[in-house]
UniProtKB/Swiss-Prot annotation:
One of its GO terms (molecular function) is ATP-dependent DNA damage sensor activity. This is DNA mismatch repair protein msh2. Pfam families: MutS_I, MutS_II, MutS_III, MutS_IV, MutS_V. One of its GO terms (biological process) is maintenance of DNA repeat elements. Its main location: nucleus. It is found in: Nucleus. InterPro entries: DNA_mismatch_repair_Msh2, DNA_mismatch_repair_MutS-lik_N, DNA_mismatch_repair_MutS_C, DNA_mismatch_repair_MutS_clamp, DNA_mismatch_repair_MutS_core, DNA_mismatch_repair_MutS_N, DNA_mismatch_repair_MutS_sf, DNA_mmatch_repair_MutS_con_dom. GO terms for cellular component: cytosol; MutSalpha complex; nuclear chromosome; nucleus. Belongs to the DNA mismatch repair MutS family. Involved in post-replicative DNA-mismatch repair. Binds to mismatch-containing DNA. Required for correct termination of copy synthesis during mating-type switching. Also required for proper chromosome organization during meiosis. Signal peptide: none annotated. Keywords: ATP-binding, DNA damage, DNA repair, DNA-binding, Nucleotide-binding, Nucleus. Heterodimer of msh2 and msh6. The gene is msh2.
Length: 982
């Protein structure tokens, strides 16, 4: 057997072994497995189908193994990287790479990654998607990993949480009391953007000091349901991992400061520390920095621990995030205008885009912090020239790399000279950015200087030595040819090697000319000198011209014949090439050593670089707000934040717990929350409000409407009107505008007066959960119950079409009771869109309930054409438009006619229920008489009777009921003794 045949046979044997191995692997729907085959990857079975649908978007790529008939498909390395990033970032699944073991007798797990733990694939993903300045997408979201445990003691449910953001190098902990619906935990998942959550495999003992409290499996299942509902991946680990024992030792390995109870008060949060221990153990001893064990003194590699306070941000449940379209869907296929994030994302840096996403799910509660953001936005709105320079100049924000990810590469030891050059280019761009900011003439110039200009100026000075280092060591002229190399003049030995390489290259060029003269071939057009990836320096002639080599094998050695010509060399060129390759190898080796030293020095600039990244990310979002406000169909306006109740006199020092670390003072959030909870919202007034996403869509002319919610007069608005008339849009735009105002963005209104809202809770749309055994109605009730428990007097509740999943009477009764409870017991602002017109009667009983309706024009009685006007007016809707909407949807005329007739019949019955007319009453009595006649006749008829005898018997019964028949008008007009006898 030839070596080629043997190789093919071995490959087939290995392939069969791979398919057999896959069949025996345990199935996991949350994991995608691929096999590394060297030059490509292979997905098998269900994983192949998943790859075909999500990577290729077609099943035509599926093949079938000729022995097992199992489906499979191949992926190139570049396609696999894109696919893996999508799976980890958007599809909430794990990725495993399997390959042949060292003995080549089986397969082993080579690498694995999950949405919250990408460390094994991180370098691969970053290197493939390195152009951060242009790759601003949802894939730039931080892969936040969270661990959670809980205990119930004295009827209080306490949650302990720890989470890590590897990009920002932050380790957050939190411990709080929650309801049995886990509303606070859900809000925290939304706030931190957790992609993966670690829970116990089963109920476990949670340590709190010296006591242990049992946690039953039901609590674990509730946590799982909340996590999965938020779109995060659930990972289970042994319950014994959730222990606070030795947590100080574990933290000392990864934190950037000493770990003692005096310096780290978070150690007193026992449940949070138990979750923290589980988190650290899951990630492994070296955490996200593999070399940390060898460099414990390097604090730039370590994490910053902070206490995440739920009280600092508006609470948003996942239903509100989705129903208000605050973020794009996980698949990322939606148009930019389909979500608030997409609409506002004009960021020029990846870290700015991440910061924007964080701000949207973390609206502020402190009025001063909100006003500060609006001041900064106003400064850029007022100066169009400066704004456009920052947006469009390729040498300003567009030249800033993804600094957190770049710093992470530096600290991991996986950086390159290209990374150092990008830092250098950023350092050169900073003074230009400062110059533009310094040119602003706004009344808020002092604030701009405090937040941006002065800070960036200081950091520019810190980077002067780094700029000098790069200009001294790196060949900047070579950047034009995309080469990142050390300057030969920087090192004497390197310079000697460079000079020798230049001499060899000159000799090679001379040999090229000599061969051209010898073969009588033009060295510019026919005889080509090339650096081949296999042969190094060699010569090439087209196959047409290669005839001149025949009979001259003693002078010229043919290397190969290919489509583009014949490759050959000479003895001298071969010798020169070998010498060149040896010197080049020495040059690269020596240069790599110098490059490592340069990179190591650059890595020491981690802290100032990270601080610059925070400032630039903040500026990028503020700039994005200003740009979105000015390019909108109708420019946005600055809202007036009505500070009705928040006490702001006492402010603490900055403690790095805000997303804009050290850029804004940190208010006393506990005081703010207490004040919020004890006070009602004063007002939410929007004049000519518009939905920002809808008005930005093509071919949409949006009809603006006013919104007026005021404590003591109009706290709950009931909106009725035709389907497709704009009810849902009206109530959702209020939620979106509220979020925009509290993140510091101007809003799409003419005038906006808003008090601080502490939570937006939404119950919008029907959502069957049949896979979980939950019906539409049950889902409605569960969501509504959660809202009622979580709402405070300062919340905003948005309810759309509650009670459709059950009978009309039950649905109406529940809707009435729920609405009445909200307005009388909770007292918060609420927008309630409903198809139950009877709900409008609630305003007659409760003065703070107001009725609104969306208008429609109805034609004359013959045409009955309907035109939806989308205006929201005071008062209740006086009719239903369901059949008219069916006409707009082009239902068959026969169905429309049947629906109209049935509606008329039901209306008649309904009016009868309200108070029967004489005709309807006569009909009911007549029908009862007929039933009595038939009942008596049947009892008198015998089986042996003839037909005539039966008719005679019927006449007798009719005669006995003659008085009742004659006294009933409806029966008398339809039945007579003569008609019956005939």
């Amino acid at each position: 057997m030839s070596s080629r045949n043997a190789s093919i046979a071995n490959e087939r044997t290995d392939e069969a072994r791979m398919f057999n191995f896959y069949e025996k692997m345990p199935k996991d729907t949350n994991t995608v497995r691929v096999f590394d085959r060297g030059e490509f990857y292979v997905a098998i079975g269900e994983d192949a189908s998943f790859v075909a649908q999500n990577a290729y978007h077609t099943t035509s790529v599926l093949k079938h193994h000729n022995v097992s008939n199992t489906s499979y498909c191949n992926l190139s390395p570049s396609l696999f990287i894109k696919f893996a990033e999508d799976v980890l970032s958007n599809l909430a699944k794990r990725v495993e790479i399997w390959g042949a073991n060292s003995a080549k007798t089986g397969f082993e797990l080579l690498k694995q990654a999950s949405p919250g733990n990408m460390q094994m694939l991180e370098d691969l993903l970053v290197s493939e998607n390195y152009q951060e300045s242009t790759a601003i997408s949802d894939s730039s979201v931080s892969s936040v990993l969270l661990a959670v445990t809980t205990r119930v003691k004295q009827d209080q449910r306490i949650i302990g949480v720890a989470f890590i953001d590897p990009i920002l190098k932050k380790l957050g902990v939190s411990e709080f009391v929650d309801s049995d619906a886990y509303t606070n935990f859900e809000a925290l998942i939304v706030q931190v953007g957790a992609k993966e959550c670690i829970i116990s495999q089963s109920g476990h003992e949670s340590t709190n000091g010296n006591s242990a409290v049992s946690i039953n499996t039901a609590e674990i299942n509730r946590l799982r349901n909340i996590i999965e509902g938020c779109g995060a991946l659930v990972t289970t680990i042994r319950s014994s991992e959730f222990s606070a024992r030795d947590v100080e030792l574990e933290l000392s390995k990864v934190l950037d400061s000493p770990v003692t109870h005096a310096l780290v008060p978070e150690l007193g949060l026992q449940l949070a520390m138990a979750s923290c221990n589980a988190l650290l153990r899951y990630l492994g001893p070296a955490l996200l920095n593999p070399d940390m064990e060898d460099d414990r003194e390097n604090t730039s590699r370590k994490l910053h621990l902070y206490h995440h306070n739920l009280e600092q941000y508006m609470r948003l449940d996942i239903a509100a995030v989705r129903s208000l379209n605050l973020l794009p869907p996980p698949n990322g296929n939606a148009h930019k205008t389909m979500s608030l994030y997409g609409l506002l994302n004009h960021c020029r840096t990846a870290m700015g885009a991440r910061n924007l996403r964080r701000w949207i799910v973390q609206p502020l509660l402190d009025a001063k912090s909100i006003e500060r953001r609006h001041d900064l936005v106003s400064a850029l709105v007022e100066d169009a020239e400066a704004r456009q320079l920052l947006l469009d100049d390729d040498h300003l924000l567009r030249s800033i790399p993804d600094i957190p990810k770049l710093c992470r590469r530096l600290t991991r030891g996986s950086a390159s000279l290209e990374d150092v050059v990008r830092i250098y280019q950023m350092a050169k761009a900073l003074p230009k950015i400062v110059t533009v900011l310094d040119s602003l003439t706004s009344e808020h110039k002092d604030l701009v200087d405090k937040v941006y200009t002065n800070v960036l100026n200081n950091h520019c000075k810190n980077l002067e030595k780094l700029i000098e280092l790069v200009e001294t060591t790196i060949d900047l002229e070579a950047l034009d040819s995309h080469q990142y190399i050390i300057r030969a003049e920087f090192d004497e030995e390197l310079l000697d090697l460079r000079q020798r390489l230049d001499e060899l290259q000159h000799s090679i060029f001379e040999e090229h000319k000599r061969v051209g003269s010898d073969l009588h071939q033009d060295t510019e057009k026919k005889l080509h000198l090339e650096q081949h990836h296999l042969y190094g320096w060699c010569l090439r002639l087209t196959r047409t011209e290669a005839g001149c080599l025949r009979g001259r094998s003693s002078h010229y050695t043919e290397l190969s014949t290919q489509k583009n010509g014949v490759y050959f060399t000479t003895k001298r060129l071969h010798s020169l090439n070998n010498s060149y390759m040896d010197h080049q190898k020495s040059y690269r080796y020596h240069q790599n050593g110098l490059a490592r030293e340069v990179i190591k020095i650059a890595a020491t600039y981690g802290p100032p670089l990270e601080a610059i990244g925070q400032v630039i990310a903040h500026l990028d979002v503020i700039l994005s707000f200003a740009h979105a406000s000015t390019v909108a169909v109708i420019p946005y306006v600055r809202p007036n934040i009505v500070d009705s109740s928040i006490a702001q006199e006492k402010h603490g020092q900055s403690s790095n717990i805000l997303d804009i670390v050290s850029l804004e003072d940190t208010p006393n959030f506990e005081e703010i929350r207490r004040t919020l909870e004890n006070n009602h919202c004063a007002r939410l007034y929007l004049k000519q409000a518009r939905h920002p996403c809808l008005e930005a869509q093509d071919d949409v002319k949006f009809i603006p409407n006013d919104v007026n919610l005021e404590h003591g007069s109009s706290e709950l608005l009931i909106i009725t009107g035709p389907n497709m008339g704009g009810k849902s849009t009206y109530i959702r735009q209020v939620g979106v505008i509220t979020v925009m105002a509290q993140i510091g963005c101007p809003v799409p209104c003419e005038v906006a007066d808003l008090d601080i809202i502490d939570a937006i809770l939404a119950r919008v749309g029907a959502s069957d959960s049949q896979l979980k055994g939950i019906s539409t109605f049950m889902a409605e009730m569960l969501e509504t119950a959660t809202i009622l428990r979580a709402a405070t007097p300062r919340s905003l509740i948005i309810i759309d079409e509650l009670g459709r999943g059950t009978s009309t009477t039950d649905g109406f009764g529940l809707a009435w009771a729920i609405t009445e409870h909200i307005v009388t017991q909770i007292g918060c602002f609420c927008l309630f869109a409903t198809h139950y017109h009877e709900m409008t009667k609630l305003s007659e009983e409760i003065t703070t309930v107001k009725n609104l309706h969306v208008t429609a024009y109805v034609g004359d009685s013959e045409s009955k054409d309907v035109a939806l006007l989308y205006n929201v007016c005071e008062g209740a809707s006086d009719r239903s438009f369901g059949i008219h909407v069916a006409k707009l949807a082009h239902f068959p005329p026969k169905i429309i006619e049947m629906a109209s007739n049935k509606a008329a019949e039901l209306e008649a019955e309904d009016s009868g229920a309200q108070g029967d007319t004489q005709e309807v009453k006569s009909k009911k009595e007549g029908m009862a008489i007929v039933r009595d006649i038939m009942r008596q006749w049947r009892s008198n008829v015998k089986p042996e009777m003839t037909q005539q005898q039966m008719m005679d018997q019927f006449q007798k019964v009719i005669g006995s009921f003659a008085q009742q028949i004659n006294s009933n008008n409806w029966l008398q007009s339809r039945v007579s003794t003569n008609e019956v006898s005939s």
